[in-house]
Amino acid sequence: HGPLLTASQSNAPIIPLYIVEPEYWKQPFASRRHWHFIHDCLCDLDSALAEMGQNLIVKVGDACEVIKELHLKHHVSDVYAHEETGNLWTYKRDIAVEKLCLNDGIALHTSPTNGVVRRLRSRDDWSKIRNARMAEKILPKPNMLPSFPSCRSDILPAKNGPIFCDIPIGAVQKGGRKQAVADLRSFLNYQSREYLYHISAPGLSEFHCSRLSAHLAWGTLSVREVAQSIIKRRSQLSPDEKKSFGRNLTAFGTRLAWRCHFIQTIEAQPDSLLLH
């Protein structure tokens, strides 16, 4: 996690912050299925952060109001975050947060998290930039985080909390970093064997797809991490395994690049996509 690692190197107290925004969960694109997955992720993240010395701080409220309150109480000097390509609602929220930081003298530092290039000047440069990002070294986690005992967390809303949408029908995919690593390993070693043959079949695709989309969307895996894991797995294949896994892993790697490319198009041409 680039922003967290960079923040930890400042040796200043850190607030690892997640904001539950009630207005977000009122939007038509929001789903309690998302929250079930995110809840798993946050519980996992809290445990991992606690091992470094500082628990996750959860706040419920409007993002700007939460940041403003934290700034008034704790004199926040910097905010470190990943770039994201969301929808119109999240875009407007991001702009509001940027204005708040600018007006209140808070330095906002954002880092890319995938192959999407913010303010790309030429499409001809995209593939080269994306490939260079995928080849960068996986960042280590911080050894420790200075504790911030004066900053108190709100209670993490329950999966069945009233601010979320309708109760989901059927099973919901389990989230969290540990589950993400297990799902990636399982796909590389087992499901990917017949990925190409069954990915378009409504019935069989359930058993041969990667199950990584939600992990990539909510950050329990990075695109770079998955791309490098594919390369590593291919290098370990025996001659017999290359016949069954090789082509399938290559195809999945291509689709992983498509994911970045499609999001890049949304980033670069949001108005055009809304019209069509």
Predicted regions and their residues:
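Aromatic-anchored, charged helix-turn/loop surface patch used as a conserved interaction hotspot
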Residues: T254, R259-H276
